[in-house]
Amino acid sequence: MSLPTVLEKIIARKLEEVAERSARVPLAEVEALARSASAPRGFAEALRAQVESKEPAVIAEVKKASPSKGVLREHFVPAEIAKSYEEGGATCLSVLTDVDFFQGSDAYLQEARAACGLPVIRKDFLIDPYQVVEARALGADCVLLIVAALGDAQMLELAATAKEVGLDVLVEVHDGTELERALQLETPLIGINNRNLHTFEVSLETTLDLLPKVPRERLVVTESGILNRADVELMEVSGVYAFLVGEAFMRAEKPGAELRRLFFPN
């Protein structure tokens, strides 16, 4: 299947970005920063502990905007949002660092992580080992690898780099073919994105269809389209307890209160 146009544009921009950033701060410098960064908080471990107790493990997203929806939150203070999520019962945070398409920032990740005790994933479009090392230098505990954006060799190289610098990996898939490729990686975390990259339509059936093909020892995170209690219950009944949710929270006045309402109503 051909790459969706928006993903093509993003990848083209990332190639430029890596060239710009590595010219500004050479890899050796970023590696030194990564070595001196505060210890990883154990992203996969935190999710697993929550899932094993059959409690919702929520990766709550700090996200200002998206290419399809525009600005989601005008009053955007990452530290405030992170604290609100922690109080609301989030297990981990996801912070968008992509500038051009999601109005994210590296600083947002640093501010959010400093404001709470939760493990944080750098949500960006990683195509080069430089960005993985950079994620650790920023203080991230985990990185996202999007199978649709990567070749197999590239994906394996990025996962190996993550392991070297002490980062967990969440590998994201959209269909069965991508899932087969993702299972080459050792990471326990498999993210199933319910949004079709070509049409932007969201269907929770994506998670339910792919679930039987995921080995039991892996931990499935369902991403996109969790909007109400019925969605949460549908997943839990199917044995999925890990969720990545952004938009539903970002549009709420108090993101953490919305998280609690959606996942911990009692």
Curated annotation (Swiss-Prot):
Query: What GO MF annotations does this protein's record show?
Result: indole-3-glycerol-phosphate synthase activity; phosphoribosylanthranilate isomerase activity
Q: Could you tell me which Gene3D superfamilies the record lists for this protein?
A: Aldolase class I
Superkingdom per UniProt = Bacteria
- Reaction it catalyzes: 1-(2-carboxyphenylamino)-1-deoxy-D-ribulose 5-phosphate + H(+) = (1S,2R)-1-C-(indol-3-yl)glycerol 3-phosphate + CO2 + H2O
> What pathway is it annotated to?
Amino-acid biosynthesis; L-tryptophan biosynthesis; L-tryptophan from chorismate: step 4/5
Extract the NCBIfam families matched here: PRK00278.1-2, PRK00278.1-6, PRK00278.2-4
Family according to the record: Belongs to the TrpC family.
HAMAP family to which the protein is assigned, alphabetical:
IGPS_B
Write down what this protein is called.
Answer: Indole-3-glycerol phosphate synthase
